Amino acid sequence: MFDILVYLFENYFDAGNCPDSATLTRKLTMAGFDDEEITLALDWLSDLSRHDEEGYLAGLAESDSMRHFTEEEMEIIDTEGRGFIFFLEQAGVINPLQRELLIDRVIRMDGDTASIEKIKLVVLFDLWIQNQLTDRSIVEGLFVVSDSHQRH
């Protein structure tokens, strides 16, 4: 699924909008992706675009409380990934509600663990869907800032 999401971002970011699901399925199949993986990726994207905030407290977006990860979350999201999520929140890229949605979406991705690259991709897709990514410089800035953060 990760490879499909990377492919979609690389091919449709500049276009502004992705084609409809049927067109995407056809194009992804022609690109050589497996039908089951395509379905998983498109379902995941559909969930992402819904911004399902019903399971979260209404005031969470304004919260300044400290987040502690559960044992399950720590098994999937390593120290580097958790640090990156914390960094994004502290830098004002995401708010606490977006952080919770991000963690939920990362947990739902395929694979046993979530690499920093997967977390970055989820953030990029989320910001893209919310129209908070207006140009490529923001994308590049996110990666440059996060890379310099990782060196400290």
Swiss-Prot record:
Disulfide bonds: none annotated. It holds the Pfam family DUF494. It comes from the Bacteria. InterPro entries: Smg. HAMAP family: Smg. Belongs to the Smg family. This is Protein Smg homolog. It comes from Nitrosomonas europaea (strain ATCC 19718 / CIP 103999 / KCTC 2705 / NBRC 14298). The lineage of its organism: Bacteria, Pseudomonadati, Pseudomonadota, Betaproteobacteria, Nitrosomonadales.
